[in-house]
């Protein structure tokens, strides 16, 4: 009698496992893996999924409601002088807490200016992983607003990208200064030729581009 009971229990367990396995097969994994394709990073305020991580002087970032390219506010970066005890440079990364599908875009664009003539580094893909890092060195800024375009190579691979925008800047002539960023967003420009090599020159682009392919 005990033998028959044991067999019956085992068969019941097998039946339950088979039933659960059948249910699992009905789940659409493509739906589960879908990430939002939001374009905005900062348009007067942080996008809904946006987080910030400071580098260098941790208090370098703020929101400015007086100096803007368009709208009601901009990002303000206070670059410290080299002797600042809280940090000798300013940097930070803006990232998505969940990840975004950027496959439909070919560039990150924004407007920028500085209180003095300077050169900074900007890019995308510098959070959690740098597999698809796009780094632009020597971006020239001055007191006038300029539109900056960061081309995105291989955007079809960016299905769950977290690193949306980063910046890095140091003092000029041992003095601190201010940088502003505004209207930071991803766009589909359709006019960019994405070379898959490093340190390339892009016509009309103010800087040296390093692409991770």
How would you label these PLM feature ranges?
Residues 1-21:
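Sec-dependent bacterial lipoprotein signal peptides
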């Amino acid at each position: 009698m005990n033998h028959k009971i044991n067999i019956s229990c085992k068969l019941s367990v097998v039946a339950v496992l088979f039933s659960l396995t059948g249910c699992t097969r009905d789940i659409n994994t493509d739906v589960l893996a879908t990430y939002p394709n939001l374009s905005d990073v900062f348009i007067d305020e942080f996008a809904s999924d946006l987080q910030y991580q400071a580098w260098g002087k941790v208090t370098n970032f703020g929101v400015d409601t007086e100096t803007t390219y368009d709208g009601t506010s901009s990002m303000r970066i206070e670059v410290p002088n080299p002797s600042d005890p809280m940090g000798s440079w300013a940097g930070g990364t803006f990232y998505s807490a969940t990840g975004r599908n950027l496959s439909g875009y070919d560039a990150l664009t924004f407007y920028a200016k500085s209180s003095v003539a300077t050169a900074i580094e900007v890019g995308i893909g510098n959070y959690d992983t740098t597999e698809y890092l796009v780094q632009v060195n020597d971006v020239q800024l001055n007191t006038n607003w300029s539109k900056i375009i960061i081309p995105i190579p291989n955007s079809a691979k960016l299905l769950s990208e977290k690193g949306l925008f980063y910046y890095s800047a140091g003092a000029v002539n041992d003095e601190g200064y201010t940088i502003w960023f505004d209207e930071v967003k991803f766009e589909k420009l359709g006019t960019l030729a994405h070379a898959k090599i490093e340190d390339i020159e892009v016509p009309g682009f103010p800087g040296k581009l390093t692409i991770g392919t």
